[in-house]
A protein has these predicted regions:
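Active-site-proximal mixed secondary-structure blocks
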Residues: 7-49, 53-182
Length: 182
């Protein structure tokens, strides 16, 4: 890590939080969507996710994110197994959510186009999103591709039609949790 990057990381005001005290906030926010940010080989991307959960496994705090195999985010996570979860606490920008939830990061810089501001994370190499200050920094400790054929038929029909990709589950150990403050 370069000196300038170290100074930027320290300059950003962050209030450390206990992730368990915000688990309900994060779970409720998933209903409308939260951002998952990834970065690899100099490319940053954020996407809106509505599926995930937070808890403990293997004596570690974990956020599990589900990403379709067709997504650009999956490519980035497979190259750099770190991500941030960025949760709105005072509402959300519908334009940013619409863009990041429907456009492909292979084709455009969604973060820039959505007018979002990235800030260096404390531990992982993936940035956080300033406008969505409740942040979890995660390192993938386990990854598994779903086999939709093992799901009940009603779920298969609703979520996995013939032309729809399956999901990869990324179990990210929560290595830092904080609120970004101005």
């Amino acid at each position: 890590m370069r000196l300038g990057e170290t100074m930027r990381r320290k300059a950003m005001n962050r209030k450390k939080i206990d992730y368990t005290e915000y688990a309900n906030v994060i779970t409720k926010a998933l209903e409308k969507g939260i951002f998952l940010t990834s970065k690899a080989e100099g490319n940053e991307n954020c996407m809106v996710i509505g599926w995930g959960h937070i808890g403990r496994i293997w004596e570690k705090p974990v956020f599990v994110a589900y990403v379709r195999t067709s997504r650009y985010t999956r490519e980035l996570l497979d190259k750099n197994p770190e991500f941030t979860v960025n949760v709105p606490v005072n509402g959300f920008d519908k334009k940013a959510f619409a863009l990041c939830g429907t456009k492909n990061g292979r084709d455009m810089d969604k973060i820039r186009e959505a007018g979002l501001t990235t800030v260096p994370s404390e531990i992982v190499s993936v940035p956080a999103i300033k406008e969505y200050p409740l942040t979890l920094e995660c390192r993938v400790i386990y990854r598994e591709e779903q086999d939709a054929s093992k799901l009940p038929s009603d779920i298969q029909k609703k979520f996995y039609s013939i032309d729809t990709a399956e999901h990869v589950s990324y179990y990210g150990e929560i290595v830092a949790a904080y609120m970004i403050e101005d």
